[in-house]
A protein has these predicted regions:
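Alpha-helical transmembrane segments of helical membrane proteins, especially in multi-pass transport
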Residues: 118-128
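Short, glycine-biased loop/turn motifs at secondary-structure junctions and
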Residues: 1-112, 128-129, 134-135, 140-186
Length: 186
């Protein structure tokens, strides 16, 4: 059902990040992706499910998901935070080293203290280029580092700045991810 998540079992994804004890207990070696997602949803383990989906989706889909999820908080973002989101969208549409390095500058300026800065970091860590200064020998990021940053962007924005719509935000966010996982362009 989720053609953009190229894994057989939920455990393959769950082992890629630090999940809650509840998620660990729910997803055994045999549980397929669809049933793993359903179990996390039914138990309202949204924090875990966001990490699960961020690690399951391909890089561009994951970053696109993060950008569209963060749009839900657009009323609280500063001009620079909004630029992080628009730069991430631009990178997804037309990946370039220029956009990747621009995202690095945004994440550095914002010091990873908000959801949009984590989204910018995800673009920088996407795996297409070095994560050190351009004049140094190339150092590529760990394979799923961008996933951790996308999950960080979404989960951070669910809580901060404070508000009373966290569950609604998570449900909308997860809906976007599941549509992307099915192959939609959301």
């Amino acid at each position: 059902m989720y053609k953009k998540i190229p894994y057989q079992t939920g455990r393959q994804l769950l082992d890629r990040f630090s999940s809650s004890d509840e998620a660990q207990a729910l997803i055994d070696e045999e549980l397929n992706i669809d049933d793993s997602i359903e179990a996390l949803l039914e138990n309202e383990l949204y924090f875990d499910l966001v990490q699960f989906l961020a690690h399951g989706l391909p890089v561009r889909e994951a970053i696109w998901w993060g950008a569209h999820t963060l749009d839900a908080r657009n009323d609280v973002w500063s001009a620079m935070q909004k630029q992080c989101i628009s730069t991430a969208k631009a990178w997804v549409k037309s990946p370039s080293e220029e956009q990747r390095r621009k995202s690095e500058l945004f994440s550095n300026k914002l010091k990873l203290n908000c959801g949009p800065s984590w989204l910018a970091q995800a673009v920088f860590w996407n795996g297409s280029g070095s994560i050190v200064a351009p004049d140094l020998p190339n150092v590529l990021p760990d394979p799923f580092l961008y996933s951790k940053a996308v999950a960080g962007a979404i989960n951070h924005s669910a809580a901060l700045p404070n508000w009373d719509k966290t569950d609604e935000y998570y449900k909308k966010s997860i809906g976007i991810a599941l549509e992307l996982a099915k192959g939609s362009k959301a």
